Amino acid sequence: AFANTGVEIVSIDTYLFSLYDEDK
């Protein structure tokens, strides 16, 4: 997540983080 070691992880993390951020 915070440690971008892969494009896939970054994409998924960004997506989930967006939902989490909007959810607050």
Curated annotation (Swiss-Prot):
The entry's comment on post-translational modification says:
The N-terminus is blocked.
Name the residues that span the membrane: none
> Could you confirm whether the keyword Hydrolase appears in this record?
no
Q: Does the keyword Protein biosynthesis apply?
A: no
Keywords of the record, alphabetical order, are: Allergen
Q: Which family does it belong to?
A: Belongs to the glycosyl hydrolase 17 family.
Which protein, by its recorded name, is this?
Major pollen allergen Ole e 4
